[in-house]
């Protein structure tokens, strides 16, 4: 029975009082931003409303491990004293003194139905309308185009259920105070349209959507200086429907107008979108029916905030989002509970984050983030935390931050985690304060992943950052092929890769480089390439470190680790064992710290290995092999201790047989350096970046389709392949491969075709032998007998020809049917750039013609192909050459001026000329052929046309009579024709003879 309103919340925790802010839920309170509370504390809620304290008798008791962060809690009805329904507090007097053409409402407390107002049924375009109080839209209504709608103090528009409101090129704005909202009821619809776009500004909740409402906005729509631009809270019904949108601007430029109640204060635009309980919110879109530039969230405190919702974000830019004014601020995208996908693509529609405090936050849910660009990030780029059994995929993002890059914290156990192919660069403007600056931070609770967890192919650069890849209480992860570059001016003790309390992990083929000077003093705080602390059962293979004090630093208990095949260049120590805090232990106790390790490696530094204690028990059951001297151990090899040996002969000194080698690239028939560079996005093609990058990506994608074995166990190529499989590029390559496969006979068809070919060859041999016998016959009886035998062979050959013709007819029909299906798929493709548009167009013509056995082009197809063929191949891609090849089916003289395209000269549109086809000119295709010809007479025949087929000696072999009334004809060639050249002849009505040379393949 509470009234709706904003209820301040006071709660007590650990003896101190705190105040949290809530939104206008009914009997529901949203806690957010509350962390690190003492265990087993009791929360006593006091709701301040109408100057009265309502005390709930400890309705919430939180136990150890429970979190308040962004969670919904419902107040038990039995614990709250009910209040009688109160009338809504009167709005202060209206004060909007603008000149207007039409006014709706008499004062700021009035409620007016549209159908009884002065603006119904219509008003002239360009009108100025003032709304006082509440306007109920109780009929479908199109606001006059280019009109301005001024909203008086606390005014609002309510679109009633069953009706639609359309704003086209309108501006909705406040006068001196904020106005409430355009509230869209269940079953109501709101449309924002226009050529220059509709602008909505100065609203509290500019568009407030109810369950079951529908909202559509076109490109160029602008939301300016609203507290929240689009607002939705699930009330328990079907969610609102926000239709796909692009090119929409959400912007904050200045402090907000004063709140209409005179009490509440909103200092700045809080969020572009705020939703709670939405089953699938899509921000941005990739579909063909949505045009426009990226959505932009600029100058707000947050871009997109979502709670208990599944969210997808495409084609959006987040800029200048600062951590001011509110408890939650500075987020590009923040989702708490639910899931978040920011998939992007390699070539377009990725999300950008510029000058934001934080890029993306996901709390307790699945996360997929790909191909984002982040620059000027103050805190972190991507963070996912406080979840379990979730899928986390962070791939191919480019992050530039001043503090942290990628964070996964308290997500144990993950179902599957992939952090791969990201570029992270951190430049600290000031010296490290809390030591938490890191490129990738992984913190867990020692629960291994359900499926797998890999951190691979990342390129990480840090200046004055203590940690490159930091792992704390992480078990069962694989780190491979990462490149970490560290430097320092204020931070000495950086670690390229650091494992703390983390067991059963593998580190393979990672590279760490630093800027250590070899005369620096060594201690725990000095730079180390890789360090292990209290981390057991580790597998380290084929890693390389350079220019650090310690190549590999091992401290405390690191038992039963396999440390092998490393290269430590320009280091004070290749391997450094540091056992602080264990002096005075008995030998057996000390032996448990570092026993059972095996290490093979090489370095060019000062010492091969250093052990802080020469007592043999520290390294019992351990073996260390190095390839050559000088590789002196410290303590020295006295007695000798037996744990440190020079040995050039051991096969373990190379990576050839290592576990990591199986995860790498190359090797015989496998992919090479170019494929690797393309998959990583490291190719710099120069001038035509987009075109060449697209072409290389399509080529590598095609290779992977032909070599699925390259994907096995290789996360780099698997991620690259998956990232393109659902894009238009991947679909085009797949269609091209399927189109090529149309001309590959199935095993069954190949057997049939081979059978008939062998039979024909055999029969031709028999006929040749019979012809020789016939020429040598000395009597009429012999000739008669041979001719009879020859006739029987010819009849059998005719039977085989008919059977073979039937087989080929079925093959060609199946090919045409399959081509038609591919044509339908091709038509559904949505090209994202000129290369894809060209490829789609050429593919369409190919599937309409050659793939269906048609070897002629109509005028529309010629126009389509010529538009592609006339482009510069550098910008139009390989489809330009494919179009030119198809145009050879036409009588077209082609001169495309590629010399100008290749040089620096200004591109000149090529000149193309079409040869005028004589209306009596007959075209023959395919040529060469095997069994059939198709003819195009060039026009519908007005009279019968007779065709004659001759061999080159002038012997008439076949005659066809083509009836009038048709233009296209199918001809079956005589079955006994051998391979070679023949003449097809006909006579024009004028009496002139025309001939075509036809080639037959046997």
Name every feature range the model reports, one short phrase each.
Residues 89, 96, 896-925, 940:
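Residue-level detector of functionally pivotal "anchor" positions at catalytic/ligand-binding pockets or at interdomain
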Residues 39, 979-1002:
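C-terminal tail/sorting-segment detector
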Residues 99, 240, 255-259, 594-902:
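Extracytoplasmic/secretory-pathway proteins
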